Amino acid sequence: MKRWRIAPSDTPLSPAVVAHVVAGVGTPHLAANFLEAMHRVLPVTFCTVFAVGASGRLETVSAASSYGDTAERTASRYIAERFDRCDPHMLWLGARALPATSQRWVGHHRGDELIDDAYRAACYGDVGIRERASVLLLQPSGQRTAVSFYRSLAQPEFGDEDFARIQSHAVLLAEAAAAHGRAIAAAQTTVEAPLALPLRMLTKREQEVITHLLSGCTAKQTAQRMALS
């Protein structure tokens, strides 16, 4: 089990990937959009997005499977049994001091590293998942978010190249997940063009991040221009 701060990346992001990620903001298909977008660069089985507020309330839950609905059913059990209270990434984020600005990490663990038997069985062993790689976000408000990608026993283990790909997309995924939480809270009902509503849910600073990424800037160049941590 390991976690590390996200270093700015020199890898340019595909505009198609960026657009597909952003298009999921404020819709019931957030994790599905994340999964489809990342499939262009990273073979994975499931994607989940979990956000827990400062009060401990689950605020965002989205899940998607490459096939079937196993991730969705597993996420329902995660909610019902409050496995966020056993989730090592959520516990780690919850134990940290609140930052002045949003902080991001990449986290990784294998199912066999989990202590809680019920959590390990329900979310890993019983559904054939070996490991999870996550983009972790801690906001000044206390909200903590994990955007996670899972590999099954039939897939190769996550390696350095996979972590590099996740890291290069981490800012995009984290900003989109944060914007989604606000969109759901606002309960917008306006129907607009495919990207108009999701983009309107982003703060001005987040819109600047997305604009830089869509223009072909790398995450590192974007961070340098905007002094992102």
Can you annotate each of these PLM segments?
Residues 177-194:
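Short alpha-helical interdomain "coupling" segment at the junction between an upstream regulatory sensor module
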Residues 2-9, 13-25, 29, 33-143, ...:
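Regulatory input/activation interfaces that engage signals or partners
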Residues 69-70, 185-186, 229:
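Juxtamembrane/interface motifs at transmembrane-helix termini
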